[in-house]
């Protein structure tokens, strides 16, 4: 977003924060409305209005970008304000707001911690405010995955340094807890891309999780491409940082394997059978990132392989483009 557009959108957000109370029910009479400029993944900035009710621990944020575009296209202000008010009410009534979790209490949130993988260079500013672990050119951060009992919404909260101080917990303990948790976002899935495509077009079929102990890898071992994510397909690229997942991948692909960063939600596993070179794979990743992946969901422009001695992923030098990366 260029500076002029961001300023105009922020002015609009300030007018929303000032007047939106007039479009909301009586319970919002004493609510506080504050304009927030949020730094998302890979430097993407979004402007929203935060709603704070005295009796609530969670303060939903409604982003105003799409509503600002409606105004610029000529939609009546009153109509757009009513739409914003409706979004605020829905956010305030979402299951995660009333699930009894207090973000200020570590004991309340610790079982809902999970790990997210982001690009270090593209998130330098954000990472200054967050506890993180460096893994090659990537960084692991923690977030709270608020549970929901329906499909009405999803909420997460990235853990910042200020949270650790408030919780009186160190980063090492938090990361250990996050990786030990058993919620769906911590449950890895490895699927053959061939099976996944067949299951999409065949409603009766389904792709097998090849990490399950009772699955016969057998005939699937000759496939060229596999997708690794988690059950919820949310920030599933972090599964590649789990030691037990890497150990299982080493068993399935004893000849070695490459890791292609599809997005923050998924990585692709390519067996190292000598048919694909890191340079070619790196070019493929950059092409897909440029044309197919939303900027804030891009993980990396590089390819990784598995270091059997260190039991972790490492960058493949031949896959690295010799120009500035991730600065789109």
Task: Give, region by region, the residue ranges found by the protein language model.
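Short low-complexity stretches enriched in small and charged residues
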Residues: 3-5, 220-235
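Basic, alpha-helical nucleic-acid-binding regions used in initiation and control of genome expression
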Residues: 7-9, 25, 79-86, 290-292
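Residue-level signal for secondary-structure boundary elements
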Residues: 28, 92, 96, 186-190, ...
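Charged, alpha-helical interface segments at or near domain boundaries
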Residues: 31-227
